């Protein structure tokens, strides 16, 4: 989860989040290199003696500044597309979880387990011995290290189901079903919030995901049934 003075990503807890962080680092290295080169050229132009003052054209330079940006864009493009398809492609999920956005709370369904269904509301301030605006009365429970399918939609306006540490952000659109892969690589409790402005209480739509062992998950399913 986010903390004060945190300027980087949250600690990644899924393969997708790892890939996104690595991609971000690669892009930032490219941006820093380009920025450094640009600043150097600017200072060099100010400090030189105008030795190329009457240079009107140079085909070699023009070819270089056309090819180099194309190569840089391709270097950025291919990893980006790979991550995009990895997140969107559903490969043999163990089961599906349906997340439905409402104004201003979430509901969850487990269709493969006797249609378990429950609502998830933000806890009141008076209940706080926990994290402000992030704790919910019911958590979405998932088994760790098992590929799942998250299906999301909405009953009213557009919401967005987002858990940064899992590398997940998917819009919940009324009348439409979106899906993506969901997998956690370690046990823990992960926090998120609705990331699409959806009305007056948009800021009070927290998401709480608990990743547990498969044995504990099945015990929870048994109790819910």
From Swiss-Prot:
The record lists Cu cation A1 as bound by: 159, 194, 198, 205
CDD domains xrefs: CcO_II_C (cd13912)
Binding of Mg(2+) occurs at 196
Catalytic class of the enzyme? translocase
User: Which of the residues are on side Mitochondrial matrix?
Assistant: 48-62
- The membrane-spanning stretches of this chain are 26-47, 63-82
Question: Which E.C. number(s) belong to this protein?
Answer: 7.1.1.9
Q: Which Pfam families match?
A: COX2, COX2_TM
Q: Which family does it belong to?
A: Belongs to the cytochrome c oxidase subunit 2 family.
Name of protein: Cytochrome c oxidase subunit 2
- Organism taxonomic ancestry: Eukaryota, Metazoa, Ecdysozoa, Arthropoda, Hexapoda
* Gene behind the chain: COII
């Amino acid at each position: 989860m986010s903390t004060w003075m945190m300027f980087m990503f949250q600690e990644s807890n899924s393969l997708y989040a790892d890939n996104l962080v690595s991609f971000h680092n690669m892009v930032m290295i490219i941006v820093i290199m380009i920025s450094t080169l640009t600043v150097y050229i600017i200072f060099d132009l100010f400090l030189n003696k105008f030795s190329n003052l009457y240079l009107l054209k140079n085909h070699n330079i023009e070819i270089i500044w056309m090819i180099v940006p194309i190569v840089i864009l391709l270097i950025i493009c291919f990893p980006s597309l790979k991550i995009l398809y990895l997140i969107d492609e559903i490969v043999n999920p163990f089961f599906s979880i349906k997340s439905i956005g409402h104004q201003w709370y979430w509901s969850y369904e487990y269709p493969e387990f006797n249609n378990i269904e429950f609502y998830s509301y933000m806890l009141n301030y008076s209940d706080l011995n926990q994290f402000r605006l992030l704790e919910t009365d019911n958590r979405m429970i998932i088994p760790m290290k098992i590929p799942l399918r998250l299906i999301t939609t909405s009953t009213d306006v557009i919401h967005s189901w987002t858990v940064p540490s899992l590398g997940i952000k998917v819009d919940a659109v009324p009348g439409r079903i979106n899906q993506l892969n969901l997998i956690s690589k370690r046990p823990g409790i992960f926090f998120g919030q609705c990331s699409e402005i959806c009305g007056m209480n948009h800021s009070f739509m927290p998401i709480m995901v608990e990743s547990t062992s498969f044995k504990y998950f099945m015990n929870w399913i048994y109790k819910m049934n």
